[in-house]
Amino acid sequence: MRIVFAGTPEFAAEHLKALLDSPYEIVAVYTQPDRPAGRGQKLMPSAVKALAVAHDIPVFQPPTLRNEDAQAELAALKPDLMVVVAYGLILPQVVLDIPRLGCINSHASLLPRWRGAAPIQRAVEAGDAESGVTVMRMEAGLDTGPMLLKVVTPISADDTGGSLHDRLAAMGPAAVVQAIAGLADGSLQGEVQDDALATYAHKLNKDEARIDWSRPAVELERLIRAFNPWPVCHSTLDGESVKVLAAKLSTGEGAPGEILSASKDGLVVACGDQALSLTRLQLPGGKALAFTDLFNSRREKFATGKVLGQ
């Protein structure tokens, strides 16, 4: 079977690795154009491109698949199937129709819940009990196609966006390989999604990461976990930015953002309902530290009565 793979970040690269170890022929890889990255803003290849180059697989990086030249280039590859994982470009219907068996997608949620750009973080933020990977046939709509296969994992009370991402990135590749086998032998037909159950995982916005201390502590604790490692929740103290990488629910009352206590166990801050104990912070110019270490060296900065977010 001739497969074209389309993907961009590390999550997609894990899927490409599994396909390279499978009996299927990867005839080409599509990925987004190189982007500036790092302090020097040098053009850097995507994780998928780096892996493809290392395996001598032809790489295509069109800025769009909406023009006829890009579509003709894909058609010339004569693919049987296109596997799309976190590619980042919209595939018009003419592209979806090029492969003999169509296009399939590995999506990091239990569809139809959390269609869209940020399903992993939104699942943690919402307090979902479980997440997973859905392999589906692609349609012109956003993550609306018939579902071929699902794998499920519970979301634990200490899962972050990063830890759930890594777990799903490890689960998804085997599901894709299994789905391809099912398509090849005709055993997988696909289950139509119930649009009435659909929710949308909107793209992450850095402004969302600014902590609003008037919100309930339970919501903020989930948000802090969901946005770790990016975009990372933050607030201000004494006019300086403070990144909050970990917190746990606590008790106490005060004005939203008010420091209620500080000890080696954490910095307890009042919220709109209950309080949070901040256990891992990062100050400007420093690295992320357990609050125990900050408390020992910067005790005066975290005096009771000070207010975060002002």
Swiss-Prot record:
Entry GO MF terms: methionyl-tRNA formyltransferase activity
Keywords: Protein biosynthesis, Transferase
Catalytic activity, as annotated: L-methionyl-tRNA(fMet) + (6R)-10-formyltetrahydrofolate = N-formyl-L-methionyl-tRNA(fMet) + (6S)-5,6,7,8-tetrahydrofolate + H(+)
Keyword rRNA-binding among UniProt keywords: no
Pfam family of the protein (one): Formyl_trans_N
Protein family membership: Belongs to the Fmt family.
Protein name: Methionyl-tRNA formyltransferase
Species of provenance: Pseudomonas putida (strain W619)
GN (gene name): fmt
